[in-house]
Amino acid sequence: MQILLANPRGFCAGVDRAISIVENALAIYGAPIYVRHEVVHNRYVVDSLRERGAIFIEQISEVPDGAILIFSAHGVSQAVRNEAKSRDLTVFDATCPLVTKVHMEVARASRRGEESILIGHAGHPEVEGTMGQYSNPEGGMYLVESPDDVWKLTVKNEEKLSFMTQTTLSVDDTSDVIDALRKRFPKIVGPRKDDICYATTNRQEAVRALAEQAEVVLVVGSKNSSNSNRLAELAQRMGKRAFLIDDATDIQEEWVKEAKCVGVTAGASAPDILVQNVVARLRSLAVAKPFRWKAAKKISFSKCRKSCESIFVKSIKSLAA
């Protein structure tokens, strides 16, 4: 069996930043530290932080007065921010800068009296936070997930309409929805730069190339991770057997026992230790040597972080108008 490792894979800069904020808060203030929603969607990461004293909550009312509160990487609505401000809390914001960019796009549209359409998955915390940035009572904020949703949608003013996207969507699916939006609402305006983050796009490109070589693709990521689910779906659409796994213990021998080539990748919130454990598990099932498949242009983590920060700074300047 040959094992191909997608590159890039695993942690993105926004996830690493969010985890570091929680770790630093624990180191400085000590336990307990309260985190609104799972800081990132990965069971291993969340369990590790919980063991160190992080308490994950969904409602601000669960946080006692005088406590430390951290917003997750997915961002929160303006209503949640206002509620936290009204309490005697010390608040730190771990929202991914690229999610904040989308928040600012929505807030700008709201100020200008434009209506906004968000492409995203209902119920996802990032979507809830982004929808909650719109506050103009005379306008409207709408959520669509598919081209069918677009054709059924009615807005108040088609002349002043813009769209944004959740940052962790499938590039292919989003393209189809955007095409439908432009046909349904010819005057709709999109973001100056694609809202789907570079880490999501790069990892999807890597899986696309990986799936051309591998018979089976294993995606390391939790079930509630949007970007991890999109990676598994992409490989499946390419006709490959693909499985989303939390860790190596999820691997079933029958998945890979006949495979000559197995591809492995990880979602943006999955640490590399989990990938290492998956490789070890595969090697225990067969004589296997892992190869690093350069399925996408390799970008060093430091460059990813600089890119993330650069995009954020440029976005602030462009959206401040």
Swiss-Prot record:
Keywords: 4Fe-4S, Iron, Iron-sulfur, Isoprene biosynthesis, Metal-binding, Oxidoreductase. Belongs to the IspH family. Pathway: Isoprenoid biosynthesis; dimethylallyl diphosphate biosynthesis; dimethylallyl diphosphate from (2E)-4-hydroxy-3-methylbutenyl diphosphate: step 1/1; Isoprenoid biosynthesis; isopentenyl diphosphate biosynthesis via DXP pathway; isopentenyl diphosphate from 1-deoxy-D-xylulose 5-phosphate: step 6/6. It is an enzyme of class 1 (oxidoreductase). This is 4-hydroxy-3-methylbut-2-enyl diphosphate reductase. Its cofactor is [4Fe-4S] cluster. HAMAP family: IspH (MF_00191). It comes from Escherichia coli O6:K15:H31 (strain 536 / UPEC). Homodimer. Catalyzes the conversion of 1-hydroxy-2-methyl-2-(E)-butenyl 4-diphosphate (HMBPP) into a mixture of isopentenyl diphosphate (IPP) and dimethylallyl diphosphate (DMAPP). Acts in the terminal step of the DOXP/MEP pathway for isoprenoid precursor biosynthesis. GO terms for biological process: dimethylallyl diphosphate biosynthetic process; isopentenyl diphosphate biosynthetic process, methylerythritol 4-phosphate pathway; terpenoid biosynthetic process. It catalyses: isopentenyl diphosphate + 2 oxidized [2Fe-2S]-[ferredoxin] + H2O = (2E)-4-hydroxy-3-methylbut-2-enyl diphosphate + 2 reduced [2Fe-2S]-[ferredoxin] + 2 H(+); dimethylallyl diphosphate + 2 oxidized [2Fe-2S]-[ferredoxin] + H2O = (2E)-4-hydroxy-3-methylbut-2-enyl diphosphate + 2 reduced [2Fe-2S]-[ferredoxin] + 2 H(+). Dimethylallyl diphosphate binds at H41, H74, H124, S225, S226, N227, S269. One of its GO terms (molecular function) is metal ion binding.
